[in-house]
UniProtKB/Swiss-Prot annotation:
Keyword line: Glycoprotein, HDL, Heparin-binding, Hydrolase, Lipid degradation, Lipid metabolism, Secreted, Signal
Listed name of the protein: Hepatic triacylglycerol lipase
Keyword Methyltransferase attached: no
Taxonomic lineage of the native organism: Eukaryota, Metazoa, Chordata, Craniata, Vertebrata
Catalytic reactions on record: a triacylglycerol + H2O = a diacylglycerol + a fatty acid + H(+); a 1-acyl-sn-glycero-3-phosphocholine + H2O = sn-glycerol 3-phosphocholine + a fatty acid + H(+); a 1,2-diacyl-sn-glycero-3-phosphocholine + H2O = a 2-acyl-sn-glycero-3-phosphocholine + a fatty acid + H(+); 1,2,3-tri-(9Z-octadecenoyl)-glycerol + H2O = di-(9Z)-octadecenoylglycerol + (9Z)-octadecenoate + H(+)
Length: 499
C-alpha cells in the first residue's frame, strides 16, 4: 500500500467493493476474457510500467527498457545471477513506500548469494481507485511476463532463476505474470506478502496468486482479520507453503485493542497506522529473514492457531516444518501446507517454541482453577516466572498441553521451577478445604499432585521428561514452588510410586 492515509481508504473500498459503478461490476473479469489486451492498452502500459535495476543498495535504480538490450548493460544486469524483482501494491498518494528501499538494501547485502535486484514500478497504474488498480494488476502482470521472456531471448538467462516478491496487490501482479509466461517451464519462485484480499478472496486460481504460477510459491499472511466479511489480506491459502504468523489475523505490537485511544489522540491517522502495521508486517518478516541469517524463524504445519497454541503441532517429520522468508526450503507440493508460528513484536522476530505436557492429579472432587508460573533454567540462559494458562479447571486426572515461546535461546533445558502462584486468600481457602476432609483420609492424599512435565523443543526437536526433585513429596500447594529435573527413573515406575 501507499502512504498511511491509504489504509482507511482501502477499508472504505472494502466496504463498497461488491457494489457497482455506473452499472459495471467491480469484480475483475474472468481470466480468459482479460487475456486479450488491445494495442492501445499495451502501448499505455509500456510507458507507465517501469522496470528498475539496482546496481548497489544505495542506488536509486536504473531503468531497463523492453527491447532495448543496451539498457541491460547500462544497468549492470548479470545474466549469470538470479533475478529478484519486487512488486509493490496499491497506492493512494502515488509514492513508493520506504520498505521497498529497505528490501533492496537487504537483498543486496547477501555476499554469499549475490543476485540482480529489480523493481516493478507500476505506481501510476496502482495510484487509482482500488477496483481499477485490480484490473490494472492483470495488465501489469502481462508486462512483467513480456520482460522476462525478452530477457531469455536477449541474454543467456533462464526464467527458473526469477524470484518475484509481491506485496498486497503486487502479490497478484506477480501471480498474473507467472500465469502469462508461455512455454513448458515456469518462473522459479513467487513470494506473496499478505496478498490483497478484496476482490480476490474466494476466486478461482486463475484470478489470483496460486501455486500454478511458479515452480514454487510461498505466502505470508499477517492481516486476515475480517471487517464486515472482508479482510485486507487474503485468508485462503495461495501457495505451496502458506505461513500464518501469530495466526495470521493480527500481529503483536500493532495495538489494535488500543485503537480508540489512539484515534482520540491522533485522529484517523491512528487507524491507518494500526492496520498498516499488521498488513506490512509480512514485508518486515521477510526482510528480517535477510538481515538475521542466524536467527531464522521456523513455522510448523497445523490445522489452525488454536491447535498450535496447545503445542500440538511442533513436529518436523515428513516436511511438517519450514523456514519463513527468503531462506525457505523450496519443496513444490501437490497439496499445499498451512504453517503457523509465533513472533515477537519487533525485529529480530524469532522466538523459540516449546510444547509442555503436564499431568495433574486433583484428589479434591471440585475442579481447581489455580494460577501457575514456570521458571526455565537452561545451559545458556534462564527465564523467570512465565505465566501458565491452562484454559480450564484441573479435574481428577488429566494431561494438559500448551505452548510456551521464549524470545531468547536458553540452551538445553535442565531444570523447571513450577510454582502455584495463587494469593494468600486462595491459600486460606485451600486450608479450609483441607480441614473439612474426612479424618480417615491421609493428608498426603488430599491435594494437587503434579506427576510429570514433558517438554518438546520445536527448534531442536528434542524431547525431555522432568520429574520432581523430591520424589517423596509430590504434593503441590498454593504459593509453593517445586523443582523438576530430568527423570532418572522410568515413568511407569513413577506412576506406581504415586498410587
Amino acid at each position: 500500500m501507499g502512504s498511511p492515509l491509504c489504509v482507511p481508504i482501502f477499508l472504505a473500498v472494502c466496504i463498497l467493493i461488491q457494489s457497482s459503478t455506473h452499472g459495471q461490476s467491480l469484480r475483475p473479469e474472468p481470466f480468459g476474457r482479460r487475456a486479450r489486451v488491445t494495442a492501445t492498452k499495451k502501448t499505455l502500459l509500456e510507458t507507465e510500467t517501469r522496470f528498475l535495476l539496482f546496481k548497489d543498495k544505495a542506488n536509486k535504480g536504473c531503468q531497463i527498457r523492453l527491447h532495448h538490450a543496451d539498457t541491460l548493460q547500462e544497468c549492470g544486469f548479470n545474466s549469470s545471477l538470479p533475478l529478484v524483482m519486487i512488486v509493490h501494491g496499491w497506492s493512494v498518494d502515488g509514492l513508493l513506500e520506504s520498505w521497498i528501499w529497505q528490501m533492496v538494501a537487504a537483498l543486496k547485502s547477501q555476499p554469499a548469494r549475490p543476485v540482480n535486484v529489480g523493481l516493478v514500478d507500476w505506481i501510476s497504474l496502482a495510484h487509482s481507485h482500488y477496483a481499477v488498480a485490480v484490473r490494472n494488476a492483470r495488465l501489469v502482470g502481462q508486462e512483467v511476463a513480456a520482460l522476462l521472456q525478452w530477457l531469455e531471448e536477449s541474454a543467456p538467462f533462464s526464467r527458473s532463476n526469477v524470484h518475484l516478491i509481491g506485496y498486497s496487490l503486487g502479490a497478484h501482479v506477480a501471480g498474473f505474470a507467472g500465469s502469462y509466461i508461455s512455454g513448458k517451464h515456469k518462473i522459479g519462485r513467487i513470494t506473496g506478502l499478505d496478498a490483497a484480499g478484496p476482490l480476490f478472496e474466494g476466486t478461482s486460481a486463475s484470478d489470483r496468486l496460486s501455486p500454478d504460477d511458479a515452480t514454487f510459491v510461498d505466502a505470508i499472511h499477517t492481516f486476515t482479520r475480517e471487517h464486515m466479511g472482508l479482510s485486507v489480506g487474503i485468508k485462503q491459502p495461495v501457495g505451496h507453503y502458506d505461513f500464518y504468523p501469530n495466526g495470521g489475523s493480527f500481529q503483536p505490537g500493532c495495538h489494535f485493542l488500543e485503537l480508540y485511544k489512539h484515534i482520540a489522540q491522533h485522529g484517523l491517522n491512528a487507524l491507518s497506522q494500526t492496520i498498516k502495521c499488521a498488513h506490512e508486517r509480512s514485508v518486515h518478516l521477510f526482510i528480517d529473514s535477510l538481515l538475521h541469517p542466524s536467527m531464522q524463524s521456523t513455522a510448523y504445519q497445523c490445522s489452525d492457531m488454536d491447535s498450535f497454541s496447545q503445542g500440538l503441532c511442533l513436529g518436523c517429520t515428513k516436511g511438517r516444518c519450514n523456514t519463513l522468508g527468503y531462506h525457505i526450503r523450496q519443496e513444490p507440493l501437490s497439496k499445499g501446507k498451512r504453517l503457523f508460528l509465533v513472533t515477537q513484536a519487533q525485529s529480530p522476530f524469532r522466538v523459540y517454541h516449546y510444547q509442555f505436557k503436564i499431568q495433574f492429579i486433583n484428589q479434591i472432587e471440585k475442579p481447581l482453577e489455580p494460577t501457575f508460573t514456570m521458571s526455565l533454567l537452561g545451559t545458556k540462559e534462564e527465564m523467570q516466572k512465565i505465566p501458565i494458562t491452562l484454559g480450564e479447571g484441573i479435574t481428577s486426572n488429566k494431561t494438559y498441553s500448551f505452548l510456551i515461546t521464549l524470545n531468547l535461546d536458553i540452551g538445553e533445558l535442565m531444570v523447571i521451577k513450577f510454582k502455584w502462584e495463587n494469593s494468600a486468600v486462595w491459600a486460606n481457602v485451600w486450608n479450609t478445604v483441607q480441614t473439612i476432609i474426612p479424618w480417615g483420609i491421609k493428608p498426603r492424599n488430599s491435594g494437587l499432585i503434579l506427576k510429570t512435565i514433558r517438554v518438546k523443543a520445536g527448534e531442536t526437536q528434542q524431547r525431555m521428561t522432568f520429574c520432581s526433585e523430591n520424589m517423596d513429596d509430590l504434593q503441590l500447594h498454593p504459593t509453593q514452588e517445586k523443582n523438576f529435573v530430568r527423570c532418572e527413573v522410568n515413568p511407569k515406575k513413577l506412576k506406581l510410586k504415586i498410587k
